[in-house]
């Protein structure tokens, strides 16, 4: 092609694909009440569990009472936020703990409902890893564990269940979205497009991410990744190297092929790095 961005045609088994998903690093929701477990629908199962407890049945608490998004069981002073925001005209807004619920987001009678000694607030304070261990001890909570496991699979076992989505980094938000796709029971063949998913990740986290991406592929999906990380490029089935330089001096296809084929291309900067990795692996 004469100009960057031009193309002649697209070919492949596109008729087999049913959807295309661009998985970006934007927040999973604009709502401050949104969190990873509401996004993956795990909280629906947790609310049902608490509504089934003896005290809930005695007081006629439905699952809706354990939601901080609707009136009923939530603290109405902070509307389930756990905090109060004071607007400051010439400074950053001041966020303070709600004096009514002391940051626990719910009314006291809701907090009095316990499952194995834990209130709904206690569960929201658990990390994903802690929650999976906690609920795995009860076979009746299999649905909850099934919903939470994908967060572990993408390396997010350290985040809290009730952690606001606004506190997640771009990379964490992207992995929450990836976890939601892994959790889907219906596997419509989909093309997933990721833009620099390894940004800010340690090498161990990258290895976890690659396992999750390979699960998508095993489920019949196609994954397209825009990436500079050599570990990810080496794991690819097919590489398209754009260049030769960056910015306006790039955008042209330098070479394509397997990582090994790209490594043998003399004009590819990417190939030089891949060749070093391949040589290092052979030396071991």
Regions inferred by a protein language model and the residue ranges of each:
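Conserved phosphate-binding elements of NTP-dependent enzyme cores
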Residues: 1-284
């Amino acid at each position: 092609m004469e100009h960057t961005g031009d193309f002649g045609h697209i070919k492949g088994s596109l008729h087999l694909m049913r959807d295309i998903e661009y998985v970006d690093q934007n927040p999973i929701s604009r709502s401050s009440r949104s969190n990873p477990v509401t996004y993956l629908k795990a909280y629906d199962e947790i609310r049902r569990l608490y509504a089934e407890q003896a005290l809930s049945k005695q007081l006629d608490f439905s699952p809706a009472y354990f939601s901080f998004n609707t009136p009923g069981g939530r603290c109405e002073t902070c509307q389930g936020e756990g905090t109060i925001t004071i607007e400051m005209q010439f400074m950053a807004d001041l966020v303070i703990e709600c004096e009514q619920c002391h940051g626990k987001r719910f009314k006291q009678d809701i907090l009095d409902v316990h499952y194995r000694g834990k209130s709904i607030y206690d569960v929201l304070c658990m990390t994903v890893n802690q929650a999976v261990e906690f609920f795995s001890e009860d076979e009746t909570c299999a649905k909850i564990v099934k919903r939470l496991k994908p967060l572990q699979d993408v390396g997010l076992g350290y985040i809290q269940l009730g952690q606001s989505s606004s506190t997640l980094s771009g990379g964490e938000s992207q992995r929450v979205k990836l976890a939601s796709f892994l959790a889907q029971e219906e596997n419509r063949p989909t093309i997933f497009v990721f833009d620099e998913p390894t940004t800010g990740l340690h090498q161990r986290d990258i290895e976890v991410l690659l396992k999750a991406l390979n699960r998508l592929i095993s489920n019949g999906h196609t994954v397209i990744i825009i990436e500079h990380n050599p570990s990810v490029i080496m794991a690819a089935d097919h590489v398209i190297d754009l260049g030769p330089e960056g910015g306006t001096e790039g955008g042209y296809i330098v070479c394509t092929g397997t990582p090994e084929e790209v490594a043998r291309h003399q004009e590819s900067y990417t190939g030089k790095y891949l060749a070093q990795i391949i040589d290092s692996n052979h030396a071991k």
